[in-house]
């Protein structure tokens, strides 16, 4: 049992043999029935992460470790990767993140050697980007959905509550973030928050564009 409340709430992960998963899940649910425990849909997992400002590997960003085909075949031989967004699907670097780009410098340990250590140290000393939460313009969101019911140009619709909807495997979604027409970052992990009644996403942006209240544009849709 691990205490890992990534969304800012008290939470635990229970790990064990996959064959026991259903029985253990049911036992926990029955034990918590008198305490108000509730079942939540899988989409809530991602919504909580974005609302809590916690980037999620395999969804908010992709792992460069899987570029190593021998590692990939050994660890996850049947891995399915869904690549989407306005960023060129071939541009996988746009879908990776460094510790500095997601605000995880505090968990980096430099008491041992590892691949990429010099690059990590250099970026931590002089970071260029950081993680922010984007609050989407409600009128723009409504225009996207309304295009499905109006003559003229049709825009790529949002999935609710999570875009893109999570399937088996990893998502590698990346949308361009622009400021006055210039590229300043990458947006991913787009969700509808019922709590805030807003569309939100997590974005890694240039430090100059990271101030609270800064207006940027997300280039929505698939590449090409």
Residue ranges: model-predicted function:
Residues 1-224:
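Conserved, structured C-terminal
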